[in-house]
């Protein structure tokens, strides 16, 4: 009788290792370039832009704080600090929920709408320059498919 193979790590094949290293090298480089452009062009951080763009895409430009934290996969503490900074700049405000004394909503202000409206075209151009225009349509489809598979596997509910 042949003994069962010893349990151990499932080492990466050469092609798997190539894919892993490509991801590890590519993502931070592309992200850093886009984040740098965002800050230079609009004065926004990635976190600012993420909050503004999510709120800007909701009905009434508002969302429960707890739902926003869950959607963004941030701790409530991290979101609270981010919202405090954004409130100080007048981009958002927090309001109590009339039907729930414990709940709070974050609301995009008119100033916040103006900021995201001005920043979005510049941000899209940066995304195009550093990612979209570098890839063929087929590569973009593959990237989108890979992203969706990983998001589903990790339980993500919405694009942020």
Residue ranges of each PLM-predicted region?
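N-terminal leader segment of winged-helix/HTH proteins
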Residues: 1-42, 89, 137
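N-terminal helix-turn-helix DNA-binding core of bacterial DNA-binding proteins
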Residues: 32-77
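Charged, amphipathic alpha-helical coiled-coil/dimerization segments
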Residues: 2-8, 84-142
